[in-house]
Structure formats: C-alpha cells, structure tokens
Amino acid sequence: DRDGNISWTLAGRIPARSGHYDAQIPADWTQPDTGWHDWLDPGHYPVLHNPASQRLWSANSRTVSGDQLTLLGNGGFDLGARATQIRDSLLAREQFTVDNLQAIQLDYRAPLLTRWHQLLQTTLETADDAASWIPVMKTALAGWNEQAAADSVAYRIVRAYRYEVMKTVLSGFAAAVRQHHENFELPRLSQTESILWQLIEHQPQHLLPAAYKTWDELLYRCAQTIAAQLQQDGGITERNWGMQNAARIKHPLSQKLPGWISQWLDMPHDPLPGDHNMPRVQSPNFGASQRSVVAPGQEE
C-alpha cells in the first residue's frame, strides 16, 4: 500500500470443514463431523503480512504450512522449483528496476535438472557397454549450461531422462495396483522429485520395479530408451529443445479447415525457450497468462 506494507492472502471462498477428517481420503459425508458445514469467515483466512524478507512470491507453490496448510488442504500445489528461482532472484537485490523484474519473469535457467545431468553423466561413465550412442550422448551433454534454451541439445536430453526415470519408477508402484484394478492410472503427482531422489540414492531393492535386477540397470535402460527416441530424424546431436518446444498456437477454426487455409490462421511454429518448473513457463500450447511489472504510483 502507500505506506509500503505488503500482504498475501486468498481471494474467493474457502469451505469450513467439519471435525478433523482427512480431506485427501474419500469419506462419507453423511457421517458426523465429516464434510463441509459452511464457508470460512474471511477473518480466519491465512495471511502473510510484512514478512521479514520483505518479499512475497507464490508461483502456484505451497505458501503456508502447519495449521494454515491444514485449513487450506492440498489443492495440487506445484513442485516449487519455479518459486525457488523467483525467491532467490528477489533476495539477490535490494533495489529493482523494471528490467530487473522482467528478467526474473523471463528466467529460463534449469537448476532443478543439474543433478539429473550429473546422474546421467555418471550412468554413462559407469556403463559396461560399448554401444555407439553412448559417446554421442556424452558429446551432447558436454554442452550443458543449465538453461532451457531453444538451441540446447543437452537440455532436451536431460529433461527427457528425468521424465523417463520418473515414469519407470512410478509405473512400478502402479503395477502392483493394476494386478487388482487393471484400469488404474496414477493421479498427477507434482511432489515426486524428493521421493525419486531418495530411491535413487538409497536404492531399496524391495521398491525396485520387477523388470530390473538393480537400480543401476534401471537408470541405464532409461538412458538407452531416450537415446533410441532421439536418434531418429537426424540423430541425438541434432535434436535441440526448440524442436520439441515449438509454438502450437492454433486458431479456433483451423482444425476444421484444410491445411492450406490453416497455415494462414495459425501462429508460426517458433522454437521457444523456457519450460515448466522455471519462471519462464512456456510450452507449445501453454504459458504464463501474463507477464507484467507494475510500480505503485506508476501504473501507466
């Protein structure tokens, strides 16, 4: 406000829950002390007011903890990688210009993937295999600069490796459920990063997916899988991030019209820097709803 105070809270209604039941588990609301009984009084809303850091950030991640988090519940908040980068950039300065704040919004560094890059390098170095794709992938990984740049081959490889390992490990957990419910699908799980790393670092044999003898084999086979995918259409070193992350912004009518007309209605397929899990959120058909910098008293 005009006095320099800053605050964060929620807009809209929050349900007032009955009793102390766990809202993340299906429950029978006909039972006492279960379900919602009204709307929460705004006076009980979570509020962050003038934090010691003199900074506020959210980026769709968890903003509160403890009793306040219990009050809100888990609505599927983001991993927090994007919020961490924004926080660190805000704490790096005491004074900001418009350009400084815009640079934070356009930041496409990928520190989340740094240890995935290291893991993939280690996996390739220790592999007892003379496969031809290994030296090619090593060469491509040498260009790693921790950025989701459109021309980065290394970023595309490391990103694909992370998702392949994640898919493989989580599918192992789902397999046990599918033995009893064959159509079971895992929900969207945005907080799996720390769980994955605990498994990778401790390598518990009883949690290893049945198709693999060791965790090292799993990590190697995941690298082998993405190598096979990226070797198509020109080879690994030709498959940069911009080829995958190219704009796909279509006119509402173009999908129902012949291709020669659609090309005049759709936006160009420009290669895009950025990705999920970083401030510059940008994918072929999704991105930040808006990017703006406003100084109080200088709204124009």
Where are each of the predicted segments found?
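C-terminal/peripheral segments of proteins
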Residues: D1-W133, T139, G143-E300
